[in-house]
Amino acid sequence: MPMHPHGQVRHGTLFALRELQPHNAGLCLFRARPMNTSYRQPLPGTDLQFFNAQAAVEAIRPGAWSRLPYTSRVHAENLVRRCEPALLTECLTQIVERKRERDFPWFPARVVCHDILGQTALVDLAGLRDAIADQGGDPAAVNPVVPVQLIVDHSLAVECGGYDPQAFEKNRAIEDRRNEDRFHFIDWCKRAFKNVEVIPPGNGIMHQINLERMSPVIHADNGIAYPDTLVGTDSHTPHVDALGVIAVGVGGLEAENVMLGRASWMRLPEIVGVRLTGRRQSGITATDIVLALTEFLRQQRVVGAYLEFHGEGARSLTIGDRATISNMAPEYGATAALFAIDEQTLDYLRLTGRTPEQIALVETYAREAGLWADALQAAEYERDLEFDLSSVVRNMAGPSNPHARVATADLAAKGIAGAWTQDGSSMPDGAVIIAAITSCTNTSNPRNVIAAGLLARNANRLGLVRKPWVKSSLAPGSKTVALYLEEAGLQSELEQLGFGVVAFACTTCNGMSGALDPAIQQEIIDRDLYTTAVLSGNRNFDGRIHPYAKQAFLASPPLVVAYAIAGTIRFDIENDVLGLYEGREIRLKDIWPSDEEIDAVANASVKPEQFRTVYEPMFAIHADSGISESPLYDWRPQSTYIRRPPYWEGALAGERTLRGMRPLAILPDNITTDHLSPSNAIMLNSAAGEYLAKMGLPEEDFNSYATHRGDHLTAQRATFANPKLFNEMVVDGEGKVRQGSLARVEPEGQVMRMWEAIETYMNRKQPLIIIAGADYGQGSSRDWAAKGVRLAGVEAIAAEGFERIHRTNLIGMGVLPLEFLPGTTRHTLHLDGTETFDVVGQRQPGAQLTLHIYRTTGARTEVPVLCRLDTAEEVSIYEAGGVLQRFAQDFLAENSKQKTPVAHT
């Protein structure tokens, strides 16, 4: 049999079996590792037991516990409860002595998914079942070990705006029609896989449901109390960090790893304390605070860090406010953004209808286990930052980055607001074509939503109206929002201004803003108008919100309503006149509600029974239907949504030589996963649109790129399909980089659309590399940003820096991340795209490798690069060809061991 270069024997379409890495010894694949017995003791006042992490820490270093931050305490408990006993002391020492000399395991309690990455993860597991069956294994044995909760929230596009009284029903009907293939597959998964719970479409956003109901904060399982921890297939999973729950956003590949019972191996992260001082000024929302914090924390370079917010300012914030801050952790680059458990936590659990018994357990455990905020007074951090809440003014962020904060008072000085003219009913320069109250970032904060409702009421009383070209919408992350708005009498006020409920889903925040009115779209095209979107979301990257919104601004929900009235971003929102009432000029200050009224309405209108009314039936619909399913999915050959994945066969099962690689693209700083694999609407003239038309889909049912990620033939055509891409290999006659989804095929030097270039290289079996600047792969945690480049034939990416989740996804797909050393960039190397590249050296965690660059002149340049396989586990996954190949190898190895007869003497 032919040998793979890393010592694996090829067998059929799978790499044959490989000896497991030493740190996995004793881990039984696809089974939960049992809890330990040491340091287990009764939890006072309950009939439960808990693991005394403090005693374990003090056994290593007396007095160390009081200085440990919240993050370290939760991870210490996880180790004491779940780590291999033989490894416990060594792993725990990393935390106690704040070392980063070795990896330690983390066993999250849950996996939470939205339907896009959750679906692709389950497509991978269904494909893994096929691969296992092809090799004679039992496909029914492939099941998630860790509980998986999948919430369908990413599929709905706002085709009908909030001014249509039937918008919700119409949008849901369109969602069901477009996604029948996907929902059929998800329904099969619910029955065919064990340990998978599905919340169907139309019920809310995963993070808000997680915050309001799914997270218990403290689990009580088999007589043991322990902290809730989780990974989620979305970068905004830290939303629930507001409750003191360590929740980390991961890609679908890493989530699959956790689903199947594997530890998530890590090194001690940087833990940064952020002391919040002061109190916010009157009229300032949590949105204003988080946008100011995002700017501040980006400047402080907290990428990859775990943040712990504390101090008097933190204590004054409600869980709704804290969740707004925690939600945007990926925007300021942090892995987690935690608030310790305190009275605010208990108040929120009461407000959201948790049981008295659960609330009592949270308080008892937190106080006994050292997770109560008061027990952290002596905690020591690697860095201490301070932020004054009283310094925050009314803010927006834009036009294309969440950390690009601009005070509304400075809009004119920044050149955003300025002179504009309106000719009758035609759209002005800078027209706001989308105004969306959207996203769990803000709609899980009752204060923000109620502020928008009160501003709408005040505007209605003064005769102000939405401009006719503004597509307005309200898409809360939970049905409870509609209940408390109705209770407060504010739902009708929002509807009057065009902000009726269009969905309980992600919608515009995820780029699912839907089609514009055809006449408005045509006017934009004919007049080449500069148009914008204003939304209460968390991201505004170029091209994300809508193809015809050239720029987008993030703002609080009440500001979104105000901009729907103003109608243009050129409007000075603080000073210009919104309208006249009885001859009086009306400005923003005249309709902005007072803090006292917002708080009074929130206190009177948001009630525990609303949450119970919504969630008790939602979580009661998962009883076993009694229908048995085949363990193998019956793939639909004509589907453009769900297709058997190719990761165990063909080119992807072949070797990666890391030799003779040509650059597919040379890219600037801040390349996002939206550049790598966009999620918004598919246009007819795109490669994916042409493919879908060829497959017989009408253009109105193309749906979004995101919804087709279960079919690799459609999804791979999204690779670098963002029209805002700048590939520095493609320049015009004056040497200026051209914008667009373009590539230059070498050695011919022919410029063509990116997909055609990828097809050309695939047909040639040409290995590829990508060269990039700093912060490569920031943004959403979409695994297709890695899958797409791997399917294209990319074997390595050399960049000045990587965002955490995307780097992990690249490794999970068998793509080698390489980081230039400080001072080395694509510019200092004078690359023009005609070069070929080799990677030389032994791949080990953090090793220095050599990038050989061969130029057309015959010259060779040798460049040291850092191997960004950061742990032994990552090396193991990479060498296996990726996490999916590793699953199959290890499953068959375990299956083979179980079938081997034991010799008795």
Report the location of each language-model feature:
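Fe-S-dependent hydro-lyases/dehydratases of central metabolism
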Residues: 34-905
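Short hydrophobic alpha-helical segments enriched in small aliphatic residues
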Residues: 5-7, 12, 16, 24-25
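Methionine residue identity
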Residues: 1-3
